[in-house]
Amino acid sequence: MELLGQKVKEDGVVIDEKILKVDGFLNHQIDAKLMNEVGRTFYEQFKDKGITKILTIEASGIAPAIMAALHFDVPCLFAKKAKPSTLTDGYYETSIHSFTKNKTSTVIVSKEFLSEEDTVLIIDDFLANGDASLGLYDITQQANAKTAGIGIVVEKSFQNGHQRLEEAGLTVSSLCKVASLEGNKVTLVGEE
């Protein structure tokens, strides 16, 4: 997605050779028009897969996921990082390690909203080592739901997340692939 790639190159801030900050349009302030295009693109890629639900994790995955859900005309469900007191019925649970925060969180999804009748598209803002996507995939498996694929907004292709997801048998669609953050510069796949 050319527009997204331009935005990553122009507004992304390289923190170090493994961390890219995109707070200006995705992780803090959200460019709604860009996220709408992200959602539309995911719809075009997965529209024939019978998607009944979009699944993501709070918080940064919500914007692209809700835009995709709008285009699919299906609910957007997000895994919570804390169990609210209102969640009294059953839930699915898994542990996810955040590469950026270097922290492991237990995330939950209510059994009320995910079942074996669902065909799920998992959407996440970043793909580094693949732990978040694999954790969400684990939740869909616990629910006996079908996973149609994984939609990633920004993939750090120099890390092993894409490979791990494919090894798990998952279809992965990354809209922007970053080849390198070396030299304090964003280099996209195809520009090396």
Swiss-Prot record:
The keyword Transferase applies. It is found in: Cytoplasm. Its main location: cytoplasm. GO terms for biological process: purine ribonucleoside salvage; xanthine metabolic process; XMP salvage. 5-phospho-alpha-D-ribose 1-diphosphate binds at A128, N129, G130, D131, A132. Pathway: Purine metabolism; XMP biosynthesis via salvage pathway; XMP from xanthine: step 1/1. Xanthine binds at L20, N27, K156. Keywords: Cytoplasm, Glycosyltransferase, Purine salvage, Transferase. One of its GO terms (molecular function) is xanthine phosphoribosyltransferase activity. The keyword Glycosyltransferase applies. Converts the preformed base xanthine, a product of nucleic acid breakdown, to xanthosine 5'-monophosphate (XMP), so it can be reused for RNA or DNA synthesis. Belongs to the purine/pyrimidine phosphoribosyltransferase family. Xpt subfamily. NCBIfam families: PRK09219.1, XPRTase. This is Xanthine phosphoribosyltransferase.
